[in-house]
């Protein structure tokens, strides 16, 4: 049996999304969901309708791939061991496909985070800076980079790790508020 914190495979998310008639990729769906949850938004079955801005979209059925995606993402964000992972491209995807999925994920994350905008005013200075950095990534395109597999693979992995940690920091800001420097006098 799969761990409740294990994200479903990209292909399974894509297939179920298509079966439901959704025109969204797995990275977009996970990015939007992650943004919504990181910002303290919807905590229930209406998450899909909320991120798609379509009240007519039914909640994913219990035990479905999309319901497992929601449960795993929520669990990962709350994990004290920082288990949060990005759902991007399948293993073996080209560097360009992986980069495109990351930029797509970032665009969707910002949209989902914006839906939970009530927490925006409580972000730390680092949180504000991270949002600006994520916005730059969201505007990026694979055409902006030299897609030399050997040279750029490590760089893309570093950017993915930055995004992963950025999401956790933003979630922390929204969950407990920014940490203000303490004065000792």
UniProtKB/Swiss-Prot annotation:
Q: Sorted alphabetically, which InterPro entries does this protein's record hold?
A: YgfB-like, YgfB-like_sf
Organism domain of life? Bacteria
Q: What Gene Ontology cellular-component terms does the record carry?
A: cytosol
Please state which protein family the record places this protein in.
Answer: Belongs to the UPF0149 family.
Q: Which NCBIfam families match?
A: PRK04758.1 (NF003405), ygfB_yecA (TIGR02292)
Name the HAMAP family on file.
UPF0149
Q: What is this protein called?
A: UPF0149 protein PD_0802
Q: Which organism is it from?
A: Xylella fastidiosa (strain Temecula1 / ATCC 700964)
Phylogenetic lineage: Bacteria, Pseudomonadati, Pseudomonadota, Gammaproteobacteria, Lysobacterales
């Amino acid at each position: 049996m799969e761990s409740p914190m294990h994200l479903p495979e990209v292909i399974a998310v894509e297939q179920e999304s298509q079966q439901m008639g959704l025109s969204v990729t797995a990275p977009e769906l996970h990015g939007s969901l992650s943004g919504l949850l990181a910002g303290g938004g919807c905590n229930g079955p209406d998450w899909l309708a909320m991120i798609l801005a379509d009240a007519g979209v039914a909640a994913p059925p219990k035990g479905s791939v999309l319901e497992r995606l929601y449960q795993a993402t929520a669990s990962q964000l709350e994990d004290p061991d920082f288990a949060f992972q990005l759902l991007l491209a399948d293993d073996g995807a080209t560097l360009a496909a992986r980069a495109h999925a990351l930029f797509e994920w970032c665009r969707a994350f910002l949209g989902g985070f914006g839906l939970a905008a009530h927490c925006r005013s409580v972000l730390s200075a680092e949180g504000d800076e991270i949002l600006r950095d994520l916005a730059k990534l969201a505007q990026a395109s694979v055409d902006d980079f030299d897609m030399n597999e050997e040279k750029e693979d490590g760089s893309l992995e570093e950017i993915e790790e930055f995004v992963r940690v950025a999401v956790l920091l933003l979630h922390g800001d929204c969950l407990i508020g920014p940490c203000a420097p303490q004065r000792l006098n």
